[in-house]
């Protein structure tokens, strides 16, 4: 099925599009297998932030342009002393900010993977809530081969997903794994033919959109809290506070303060 994705904002190195409640963020550097630069990451952070705040968006897809690569990680040509060097000549690892944003954004994020998801590209796959893989997808880590590593989500959370032994194999040997192998180890949710991947991904989005956004928000926060320590608990606590603010009980406390009177909390139930 051909879809008319609406461009929400123009960027240089990514695409940010919308279709029937779904946002799609596409890394648009196919000439380098969608390797990211500091600018690519900054643009993705901006797009994801906009998707978070847009009440017309319920689910977000992350993908790469073309059929050959989802993302091959950081562009090694931009790697300098102390990080990846952007136009401002400051070395950065701002992809860590992007990883965290994908984790805390209160909407499901689905990785739609075609071709290579290697290095930092595989880590982006790992931090997404769900992964739909095409049958030509290839996954793996290359850090130790190129003098790099991800000691955060790319290793610790990966080990939660595939198991510690398998995660060590992935990092220590730097092998590549096909889509079926990724499915077998729990790295992806399903594998579909390449020409059907967008149809399948949109179908998953549509199913998700039928469900309670508040329930999904808390489920995501709860699952992340298990691995994100106090930062994860802070996110879940913040979500709980936002939900509480919508109740009559919270409004009574606010209104009493504004009206300079004592609040009447006795009117609210004390559930066991």
Swiss-Prot record:
InterPro entries: ClpP/crotonase-like_dom_sf, DHNA-CoA_synthase_MenB, Enoyl-CoA_hyd/isom_CS, Enoyl-CoA_hydra/iso, Enoyl-CoA_hydra_C
Source domain of life: Bacteria
Region (Disordered) location: 253-272
Cofactor: hydrogencarbonate
UniProt keyword Lyase, yes or no: yes
Positions bound to hydrogencarbonate: 141-143
Catalytic activity, as annotated: 2-succinylbenzoyl-CoA + H(+) = 1,4-dihydroxy-2-naphthoyl-CoA + H2O
One GO molecular-function entry: 1,4-dihydroxy-2-naphthoyl-CoA synthase activity
EC number: 4.1.3.36
Pfam families linked to this entry: ECH_1 (PF00378)
GO terms of biological process kind: menaquinone biosynthetic process
Site keyed Important for catalysis: positions: 84, 245
Keyword Lyase: yes
UniProt GO cellular component terms: cytosol
Keywords for this protein: Lyase, Menaquinone biosynthesis
Pathway involvement of the protein, from the record: Quinol/quinone metabolism; 1,4-dihydroxy-2-naphthoate biosynthesis; 1,4-dihydroxy-2-naphthoate from chorismate: step 6/7; Quinol/quinone metabolism; menaquinone biosynthesis
Binding site for substrate: 33, 72-76, 84, 116-120, 142, 148, 245, 260
Feature: compositional bias, Basic and acidic residues: 253-264
Free-text function comment from the UniProt entry: Converts o-succinylbenzoyl-CoA (OSB-CoA) to 1,4-dihydroxy-2-naphthoyl-CoA (DHNA-CoA).
Entry's family note: Belongs to the enoyl-CoA hydratase/isomerase family. MenB subfamily.
Annotated PANTHER family: 1,4-DIHYDROXY-2-NAPHTHOYL-COA SYNTHASE, PEROXISOMAL (PTHR43113:SF1), NUCLEOSIDE-DIPHOSPHATE-SUGAR EPIMERASE (PTHR43113)
Name of the protein: 1,4-dihydroxy-2-naphthoyl-CoA synthase
Taxonomic classification: Bacteria, Bacillati, Bacillota, Bacilli, Bacillales
